[in-house]
């Protein structure tokens, strides 16, 4: 399912391709690209839930905004988000790429992924997808994109 999301984000969303794509045509295109129908369905449902945030149909969990408070992760969250992922989320909050609401959206979307393995690189892409879809997060998206691609470019040298 995560592979389908990555493909969709890179092919349609990130490249600003035509957003009004017929779902049946999209499913056919993804099937032709080699993805399984169940993964396609799950990815489209995942994106639909993300769109609910964008449209204001779902509100992120409201938490205390005391600057001295610290997010305590549940056991389920710790199983999916290892220490490096949790540390990266904290780092993004500290540099104000994420706020309390967007952090909770990211965590919720990560937990909704149907994947056995989840790494820091995967988290970075989920963060990009969330920020891209939330109105008013354009600057945060741009900062995250710069962070993601600066690090990856640095690895090539």
Swiss-Prot record:
Coiled coil: none
Pfam families, sorted: DUF494 (PF04361)
InterPro entries, per the entry: Smg
Region forming the signal peptide: none
Alphabetized HAMAP family for the sequence: Smg
Similarity comment: Belongs to the Smg family.
Identification of the protein by name: Protein Smg
């Amino acid at each position: 399912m995560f592979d389908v999301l990555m493909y969709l984000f890179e092919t349609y969303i990130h490249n600003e391709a035509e957003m009004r794509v017929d779902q049946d045509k999209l499913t056919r295109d993804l099937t032709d690209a080699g993805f399984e129908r169940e993964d396609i369905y799950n990815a489209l449902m995942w994106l639909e839930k993300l769109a609910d945030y964008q449209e204001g149909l779902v509100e992120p969990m409201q938490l205390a905004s005391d600057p001295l408070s610290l997010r305590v992760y549940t056991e389920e969250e710790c199983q999916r988000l290892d220490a490096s992922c949790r540390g990266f989320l904290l780092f993004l909050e500290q540099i104000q790429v994420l706020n309390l609401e967007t952090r909770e959206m990211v965590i919720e979307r990560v937990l909704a992924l149907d994947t056995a393995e989840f790494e820091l690189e995967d988290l970075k892409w989920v963060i990009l997808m969330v920020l891209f879809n939330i109105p008013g997060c354009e600057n945060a998206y741009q900062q995250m994109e710069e962070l993601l691609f600066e690090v990856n470019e640095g690895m090539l040298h």
